């Protein structure tokens, strides 16, 4: 290590496994930005469920070991590399990706994945924008081709992506239905864009949704737990309806016949299949929402960096998650 190299605290993963493989190190070198790169002093980093799958080694994208998790940071620009003209030291920013990892006191990001954070949003909220809001945009507009006047059911609406989908869909003129598993979650879903909310722990909630949507059915379903809900989703759709799968934790058996009569479709969402141009389109939508005030990230559980393993444990095993889980530096 070069003499005088600045050091930071960061979470490092040296082997795939359970939450216990997240190790705090205090002697990690602060990265130096190269061309088209931005170094950010991290104030908060969002935790996404997919990061637990990556950590366990079971996800389709496996990073080289060792690595630092985290994509959604919010903070202040510390320094910039050559050919960066959009940002300067001191700018408040958030990201949709990082090069060096976000569970750290400093994070390196490519300049095209960095966006300005308005003063009206704090750093915790900034750390809740990246994957949740960009995924919701991709699900609604790229995958579902949703448009004003249609109906959307956000199946599992109280988490980060679900609340983002409710806010965006409401702002764009859709009729929004949501589900949540707790009274608190239902209240938050109604406060963030849903016209109606249903308790998905109620044994008869599917019947309640059917009563609400009538014979026509619902046009779009944004599905957060497909391995539990997909079969029921197909029975709720309108003719030409679309189920968009954002989350899944296992397999499920469905009857393909349920897709035939209504010519319904099932599509998956992978945010990082988006092109740079698509990311910019999503960013324009979200930045407009920030300016107009309908992008309002809801913060759930908050943890210090040292409790990252506990955060990973809770984000998967705690029931009734409300809002976005964040690490604070």
From Swiss-Prot:
What keywords is this UniProt entry annotated with?
Answer: Acetylation, Cytoplasm, Eye lens protein, NADP, Oxidoreductase, RNA-binding
Which SMART domains does its entry note?
A: PKS_ER
Q: Which cysteines are joined by disulfide bonds?
A: none
Instruction: Report which superkingdom the organism of origin falls in.
Output: Eukaryota
Which GO molecular function entries does the Swiss-Prot or TrEMBL record give? identical protein binding; mRNA 3'-UTR binding; NADPH binding; NADPH:quinone reductase activity; structural constituent of eye lens; zinc ion binding
The record's tissue-specificity note reads: In guinea pigs it constitutes about 10% of the water soluble proteins of the lens.
Q: Which GO terms describe its cellular component?
A: cytosol
Task: Tell me which residues bear N6-acetyllysine.
Answer: 23
Localisation per UniProt entry: Cytoplasm
State its Enzyme Commission number(s): 1.6.5.5
Give the N6-succinyllysine positions (modified residues): 296
Tell me which residues bear N-acetylalanine: 2
Q: Which GO terms describe its biological process?
A: protein homotetramerization; quinone catabolic process; xenobiotic catabolic process
Write down the chemical reaction(s) this protein catalyses.
Answer: 2 a quinone + NADPH + H(+) = 2 a 1,4-benzosemiquinone + NADP(+)
Query: Family assignment?
Result: Belongs to the zinc-containing alcohol dehydrogenase family. Quinone oxidoreductase subfamily.
**What this chain does, per the record?**
Does not have alcohol dehydrogenase activity. Binds NADP and acts through a one-electron transfer process. Orthoquinones, such as 1,2-naphthoquinone or 9,10-phenanthrenequinone, are the best substrates (in vitro). May act in the detoxification of xenobiotics. Interacts with (AU)-rich elements (ARE) in the 3'-UTR of target mRNA species and enhances their stability. NADPH binding interferes with mRNA binding.
Query: Subunit notes for this chain?
Result: Homotetramer.
- Which disease is the protein involved in? A genomic mutation causing the deletion of 34 amino acids was clearly associated with a hereditary nuclear cataract in a line of strain 13 guinea pigs.
Name listed for the protein in its UniProt record: Quinone oxidoreductase
Q: Give the originating organism.
A: Cavia porcellus (Guinea pig)
